[in-house]
Amino acid sequence: MSLTPAQIEVRRTGVGASEVAAALGLSPYMTSLALYQVKRGEAPAPEENLPMRYGTHVEPFVLGEFARVHPTFAIVPTPDTMRRGPMLCHLDAWMPREATVQVKTARTRHGWGESQSADVPMHHLLQVQSEMLLADVRVAWVPVLFGGADYDEFVVEADRELQDMIESGVHDFWQRVQRGDPPEPVTVDDAVARWGRASITDRVMADADTLQAIETMRNLREQRAQLEQAEEAANALVLRALGERDTLVDQRGAVLATWKASAPPQRFDTTAFRAAHPALAAEFTKPGEPSRRFILKEQRA
């Protein structure tokens, strides 16, 4: 659903149901550290992308389809904010004192189970369990539009043990936010976001796990170099087969590869512009953010 400005402000004061997976380190889209930085105001909230806008656009249609399939359900759309400590949610719809409704869209059925089952992707499961906890209901309906044309429904029952774990985990995460105690980085982006702007001149003794990671990186880089060489040799063979012609086909006429001329790119000559218009260039030149460069040293003989 699309949040109102007031709801967005409220969301800054806690963890929304759709953010629970990130708070617990189980989101495929955002790490705990990334969410922590958003809640602390150290990083902007993720920009709305095309799939998110599409989901917002078709949500009324999916809700309408859900109402058509269940004409006896007393569906109330977009109820007000529900809250319990740092946990909060803005439901797509619900049947008061009976069930929540969480609309989803997906390109494919990958990660989804049988129709009417509770087999939904983990981050969605954590979301609807959180919503059921806040709404104090025992059932969550999840109507889904797959690929823009395939409607289906899933039904998830409340799991009190899982809800307790969610509530405890969100509480711990929010305590970190309030204390200014960031979660440990788990991705390269996390590490860069936390430590990538400045460094101090000092040395750290590598432990056994770090030494193993260094060895793994060296091995992988060597394998990558070998694969790149093999790919380049294969590429050269294919280009020789094409010669001046632009399309390679198999015996059935199916296109295997193309090598076509493209329009020459237009590039802005920064050096020439700076020489011709130094004052204007200076006016529109801004210093970049400081950053650190990681270098993996070659193994000594």
Where are these regions (language model features)?
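Accessory terminal regions of nucleic-acid processing enzymes
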Residues: 1-301
